[in-house]
């Protein structure tokens, strides 16, 4: 792992200053770099596929603010749209035409969605969707999957992923046992366990919520039939099927994972990309369900800045640019993501370092494994087989060469339409140096 050197000296000073006034020095736990050790890198600007830290070091960025920046940093069209709207007003607390325009575009892109409600974060989206599911069914139990992260609402911080996985916390202090008791967790990809649960308690279950790709415990793909099997179980037992596409939405395909794999959820949670880099979330779905949301119906949900015009125009511009008349740039990003993933796999084979690399659309993930032949398909396996110490050495070897990856192997990576073939070449060249270093350090 990297030690503090002149390369990161200002980040070290900034971190010390931040810890005096911010708990842990960061405003979201994974940013503290606990998953890789050392100090967090402080950034000051970004452009296209690149970010620069406060020490002036340039990096090819594969975090992209944890996914929202599909077009890369400071895309000219997005910057112009935000600037023009800011000059007109940043928030009105009243309806705008931008909300309707973005709603129509999302409905056009995602086949299952008939109506949508914008909120301010992915956490608000999942929390509201689950409240809606309980209102619609009159039931109380929620089913989620170990290692899947759906935000930090009390009922969802049970065997969660993301920062909770990085920090090794099974759940969070402050969550009342009575709240946690209404969330049942089972292993991701275990359809038999889900079927057994429904056979035993199906009449009590309001909803099943799942990430189509478990990208908050690394990068775990669904087994064939897993997601469609969950859809069938919920239909049979009258529960609501919620697909959390906060991360995969508009990242793996224009219509999300559900369009890619032919799924028809009752409700969908969105975020990240639909805000174009500004705070946003949304829950959406069938008209019959969404008509229960106030003021159309009795289920209350509100927000001072929900649907604010800055986020709406940033999201609208992002989606129009990515999936408008020419979606070639998005397809090129998909191709480059696959090339990066293939290159990492080949390096693992060449240097005899066991890795598990996955990719779909513009998302990817890379586990370093404790032993050859292991395969991670669930949270239990991720905890058992993932070699976090080796990943930490790899992370810093890449950072020292100007490649910024997620500071935890329990987080996914992302590409943007701004990443070039030359960026992939540079990244794989750096990765070869890093893999060679892992071999030499083990000898």
Swiss-Prot record:
Pathway per the UniProt entry: Porphyrin-containing compound metabolism; protoporphyrin-IX biosynthesis; 5-aminolevulinate from L-glutamyl-tRNA(Glu): step 2/2; Porphyrin-containing compound metabolism; chlorophyll biosynthesis
Give yes or no: UniProt keyword Thylakoid.
no
GO MF = glutamate-1-semialdehyde 2,1-aminomutase activity; pyridoxal phosphate binding; transaminase activity
This protein's source sits in the domain of life called Bacteria
Q: Which cofactor does it need?
A: pyridoxal 5'-phosphate
Q: Please provide the record's keywords in A-Z order.
A: Chlorophyll biosynthesis, Cytoplasm, Isomerase, Porphyrin biosynthesis, Pyridoxal phosphate
Q: Which InterPro entries match?
A: 4pyrrol_synth_GluAld_NH2Trfase, Aminotrans_3, Aminotrans_3_PPA_site, PyrdxlP-dep_Trfase, PyrdxlP-dep_Trfase_major, PyrdxlP-dep_Trfase_small
UniProt xrefs under Pfam families: Aminotran_3 (PF00202)
The UniProt entry's GO CC annotations, sorted and at most eight, read:
cytoplasm
- Localization per Swiss-Prot or TrEMBL: Cytoplasm
Biological process GO terms, please?
chlorophyll biosynthetic process; protoporphyrinogen IX biosynthetic process
Q: Which residues carry this modification: N6-(pyridoxal phosphate)lysine?
A: 272
Q: What is its EC number?
A: 5.4.3.8
Root EC class: isomerase
This enzyme catalyses: (S)-4-amino-5-oxopentanoate = 5-aminolevulinate
Q: How the protein assembles, per its UniProt entry? A: Homodimer.
What the record says about family reads: Belongs to the class-III pyridoxal-phosphate-dependent aminotransferase family. HemL subfamily.
What HAMAP family does the record tag this protein with? HemL_aminotrans_3
Q: What is this protein called?
A: Glutamate-1-semialdehyde 2,1-aminomutase
* Gene that this polypeptide is encoded by: hemL
